[in-house]
């Protein structure tokens, strides 16, 4: 009656498309949850009960979930529901929510912007072929947007307080990525002792690019250098530069430069 399709599973994040075919009526007590996360309702309506707390959830809502919570889901109507599950490991949940990984286990209204971003993220992850670092960065931003509306002070805590501190964090992130572009946003956050959400936001504000876009640009510049040095094997170049495959390399290089690696190879060699 419940099916789930995992679309992202890396860097402390899982994004899954979850469908429930439960008919109208009272549900059964579910096993206790084992992880932190946010659930976004896309279709249907149900009533979630955890202990003495009950909330009605529909496509204008999300809710937080935590390890140890035992819930019961009741459906007032037939046809079940469709939801998106965004799991966060404890360290990432704590970094996003002011140091405490325990997320608000209640209904969390989603704005039209947040709902649309959530659906776009789900679609991009489901299509495949997307930069997984970019998907992770978007997922972190989505979680922060929902939590920030509920507890802005908690989400804001840990943000570099001064312009000088923000610039220092961005410079340190650029140094780290120049040494190893494969580092993920959560890894950078841990390395620099800053919330990945704040790092992403400050990085974009000061550079005009997301962390994932900057990472991809570093990889494209490395590709151009290799092409200028006479590299002929695009499959090998894609693997060395950190692209998923040759097709991924070609898409990104064309998006960044307006032309193909083959044409650039002839122009630069």
Please place each PLM-identified region on the residue numbering:
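Actinobacteria-biased recognition of intrinsically disordered, low-complexity terminal regions
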Residues: 1-8, 262, 266-269
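Amphipathic alpha-helical segments enriched in hydrophobic/aromatic residues interleaved with Lys/Arg
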Residues: 97-159, 173
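Conserved terminal C-lobe alpha helix of the protein kinase catalytic domain
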Residues: 115, 119, 136, 140, ...
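Basic/polar phosphate-binding segments, predominantly the helix-turn-helix DNA-binding elements
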Residues: 182-221, 238-267
């Amino acid at each position: 009656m419940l099916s789930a399709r995992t679309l992202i599973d890396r860097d402390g994040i899982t994004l899954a498309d979850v469908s429930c075919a439960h008919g109208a009526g009272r549900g059964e007590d579910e096993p206790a949850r084992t992880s932190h996360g946010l659930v976004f309702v896309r279709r249907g309506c149900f009533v979630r009960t955890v202990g003495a707390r009950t909330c009605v959830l529909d496509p204008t809502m999300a809710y937080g979930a935590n390890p140890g919570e035992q819930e019961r889901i009741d459906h007032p109507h037939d046809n079940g529901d469709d939801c998106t599950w965004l799991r966060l490991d404890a360290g990432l949940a704590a970094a996003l929510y002011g140091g405490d990984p325990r997320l608000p286990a209640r209904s969390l209204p989603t704005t039209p912007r947040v709902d649309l971003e959530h659906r776009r993220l789900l679609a991009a992850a489901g299509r495949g072929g997307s930069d997984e670092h970019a998907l992770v960065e978007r997922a972190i931003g989505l979680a922060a947007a929902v939590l920030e509306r509920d507890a802005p002070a908690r989400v804001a805590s840990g943000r570099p307080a001064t312009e000088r501190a923000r610039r220092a964090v961005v410079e340190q992130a650029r140094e780290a990525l120049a040494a190893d572009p494969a580092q993920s946003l959560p890894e950078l956050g841990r390395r620099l002792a800053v919330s990945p959400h704040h790092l992403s936001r400050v990085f974009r504000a000061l550079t005009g690019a997301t962390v994932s876009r900057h990472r991809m640009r570093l990889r494209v510049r490395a590709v151009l250098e290799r092409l200028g040095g006479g590299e002929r094997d695009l499959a090998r170049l894609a693997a060395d530069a950190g692209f998923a495959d040759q097709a991924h390399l070609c898409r990104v290089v064309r998006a960044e430069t307006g032309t193909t690696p083959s044409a650039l190879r002839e122009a630069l060699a």
